[in-house]
């Protein structure tokens, strides 16, 4: 929606000066980047599918970026702490330029704008398309918003701002870990996050190897620290783009089911299809999901047998065995 709000701002008198270079922090679509009048556009994003999509569209960027820019656009993410971190980072990337901050009301743009306004004057604000766009001159006064450092939570696990369950062990993952039967052989952890499940498997089960697949670059980096074991290998990949190099005896996973703030059960179903395609003939899938999510039909289509083996009022642990000749 950045394009819509920027267009509205220009129609109502906002002057956006042409500049040679602009960096976008956490854009979701190349059309939003194209909307900004700059000769060269770059981006920062840590979600692999988005990085791959924007790179394929001809934009330069990735989880980190070097250099300085004439302007920066912050596309506000869901995480409050990450959003503040991006504002500070934008000021570092465009220290002499204008910082544009865009987001939907459901993303917390109102509270972020108030926090920015308390530190530095705003140059302008527009409201459109259920969100806001505001802008200000870059300043070094946001240094306290930096959240690039790792944090240590319970049991010494390392996490970082903006990743899933950054403050504590996810309760669904904990239920799944406690429900696992003795595992052995080759394991895959799909959507591994910062590595809790894999750490548990490595600590409690005599496995030969475990491959962690995670799309969030920050989470994947944390998982390398939390699973510092020669049997573990971490892949920063999306579930669709990752190509397994072997078949697995077990897959463990706590798949995501949100696209932004909207629940998307199809995300979890894609994970189930991936698991069915990489398991051995007698392999097993262990997964945890929110109790209301409708995964049973997909499991019955792709596996010879499945059943619920644990859970509580919020979560269910599902065990599926013997994929039905499904190969990706």
What are these regions (language model features)?
Residues 1-55, 171-253:
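Conserved SAM/SAH cofactor-binding pocket of Class I
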Residues 46, 104, 214-218, 267, ...:
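Short beta->alpha hinge that forms the Motif I/post-I loop of the SAM-binding pocket
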Residues 60-69, 236-243:
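Short acidic low-complexity segments
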Residues 71-80, 190-195, 248-262, 275:
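Conserved proline-anchored active-site loop of SAM-dependent methyltransferases
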Residues 84-97, 269-281:
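A short glycine-rich, Lys/Arg-flanked "PGG" loop and its adjoining helix->strand segment in the class I
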Residues 96-105, 282-289:
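Conserved beta-strand signature within the Rossmann-like core of class I S-adenosyl-L-methionine
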Residues 120-152, 290-328:
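Class I S-adenosyl-L-methionine
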Residues 127-184:
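SAM-dependent Rossmann-like transferase core, predominantly class I methyltransferases
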């Amino acid at each position: 929606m950045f394009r819509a709000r920027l267009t509205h701002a220009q129609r109502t008198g906002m002057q956006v000066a042409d500049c040679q270079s602009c960096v976008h922090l956490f854009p979701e679509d190349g059309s939003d980047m194209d909307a900004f009048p700059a000769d060269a556009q770059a981006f920062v994003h840590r979600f692999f599918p988005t990085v791959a999509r924007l790179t394929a569209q001809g934009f330069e960027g990735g989880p980190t970026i070097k250099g300085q820019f004439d302007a920066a656009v912050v596309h506000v993410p869901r995480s409050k702490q990450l959003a503040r971190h991006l504002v500070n980072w934008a000021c570092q990337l465009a220290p002499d330029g204008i910082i544009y901050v865009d987001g939907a009301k459901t993303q917390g743009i109102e509270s972020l704008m108030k926090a920015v306004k308390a530190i530095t004057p705003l140059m302008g604000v527009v409201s459109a398309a259920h969100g806001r766009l505001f802008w200000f001159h870059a300043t070094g006064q946001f240094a306290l918003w930096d959240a690039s450092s790792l944090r240590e939570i319970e049991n010494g696990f390392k996490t970082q701002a903006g990743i899933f369950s950054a403050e504590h062990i996810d309760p669904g993952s904990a239920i799944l870990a406690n429900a696992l039967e003795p595992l052995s052989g080759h394991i895959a952890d799909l959507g591994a996050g910062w590595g809790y499940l894999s750490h548990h498997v490595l600590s409690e089960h005599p496995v030969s190897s475990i491959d962690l697949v995670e799309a969030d670059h920050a989470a994947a980096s944390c998982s390398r620290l939390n699973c510092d074991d020669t049997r573990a290998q971490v892949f920063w990949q999306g579930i669709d783009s990752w190509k397994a190099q072997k078949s697995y005896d077990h897959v463990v996973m706590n798949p995501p089911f949100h696209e932004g703030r909207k629940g998307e059960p199809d995300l979890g179903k894609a994970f189930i299809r991936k698991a069915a395609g990489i398991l051995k003939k007698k392999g097993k899938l262990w997964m945890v999901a929110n109790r209301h999510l409708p995964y049973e039909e997909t499991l019955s289509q792709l596996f010879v047998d499945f059943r619920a083996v644990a859970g509580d009022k919020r979560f269910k642990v599902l065990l599926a065995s013997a994929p039905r000749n499904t190969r990706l």
